[in-house]
């Protein structure tokens, strides 16, 4: 494989909490890494509960339903991120379990301190730590970009740059010289899903990111991504994520 990955760090934040840190039924569109500094936190998936041990780094893969809580307190740094071969093609296999590696308490403390300071040097350091962790968790047999995907790479890059609910398959196909029916069949063969499903996944990820890192109103987000109004955006998000934008924002104050 000769492709390089595209690493996008959504946010890296320090967190200190008590028993109010208690969330059920979380399922994210991004990956999350925890560097645990102190406390008695736990995570539960369908495979059972796991202690979040100080001095370790944990990967919670996108699409993994889980619960989070602590007995008395938790002190950690968390990083939400995407890592892709190209938009929509994840470079970390979605896992049915939480993965963990030793990091050391000193390393966890340095990462926590850097996340608090947020200088350019600190942000660069955090990105480097994240890249190191991603490399450690990445599978050896990661598939590359198939020949069937190659013709669509400019298209998905354009979708990423101009992401909108108003994008239409017919318009994209015509702009790149495809018959719409042939385009749909070839796209599905290459990616294992239809164009609309792929588009909705990218759009859901982007809206979720806006909800996490900005204070924009739903109306502002709706206007920015081609929805008629906040009601239609909320309905779309609830259909694709299973929860409302307001609840999603509240769940991720962690």
Where is each model-derived feature located?
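An amphipathic alpha-helical interaction segment
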Residues: 77-84, 100-164, 170-171, 175-184
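Flexible, active-site-proximal loop/turn residues at the rims of small-molecule/cofactor binding pockets
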Residues: 64, 139, 254
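Terminal helix-turn-helix DNA-binding modules in bacterial transcription factors
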Residues: 157, 161, 166, 170, ...
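Short hydrophobic/aromatic patches on the structural cores and recognition surfaces of FHA
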Residues: 39, 55-56, 183, 207, ...
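Short, Lys/Arg-enriched, disordered terminal segments
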Residues: 1-6, 250-254
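N-terminal regulatory/effector-sensing and dimerization cores
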Residues: 4-97
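Generic structural signal for secondary-structure transition and capping sites
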Residues: 17, 41, 120, 142, ...
């Amino acid at each position: 494989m000769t492709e390089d990955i595209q690493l996008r760090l959504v946010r890296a934040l320090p967190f200190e909490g008590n028993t109010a840190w208690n969330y059920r039924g979380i399922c994210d569109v991004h990956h999350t890494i925890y560097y645990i500094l102190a406390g008695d936190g736990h995570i539960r998936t369908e495979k059972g509960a796991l202690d979040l041990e100080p001095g370790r780094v944990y990967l919670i893969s996108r699409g993994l339903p889980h619960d989070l809580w602590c007995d008395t307190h938790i002190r950690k740094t968390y990083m939400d991120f995407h890592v892709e071969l190209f938009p929509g093609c994840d470079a970390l296999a979605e896992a049915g379990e939480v993965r963990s590696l030793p990091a050391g308490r000193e390393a966890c403390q340095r990462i926590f301190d850097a996340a608090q300071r947020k200088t350019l040097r600190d942000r660069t350091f955090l990105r480097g730590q994240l890249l190191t962790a991603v490399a450690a968790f990445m599978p050896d047999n990661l598939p590359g970009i198939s020949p069937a995907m190659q013709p669509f790479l400019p298209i998905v890059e354009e979708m990423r740059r101009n992401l909108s609910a108003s994008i239409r398959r017919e318009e994209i196909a015509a702009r790149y010289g495809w018959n719409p029916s042939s385009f749909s069949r070839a796209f599905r063969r290459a990616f294992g899903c239809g164009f609309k499903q792929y588009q909705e996944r990218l759009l859901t990820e982007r809206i979720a990111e806006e909800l996490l890192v900005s204070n924009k109103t739903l109306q502002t987000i709706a206007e920015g991504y081609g929805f008629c109004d906040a009601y239609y955006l909320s309905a779309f998000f609830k259909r694709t994520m299973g929860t409302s934008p307001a609840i999603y924002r509240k769940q991720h104050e962690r």
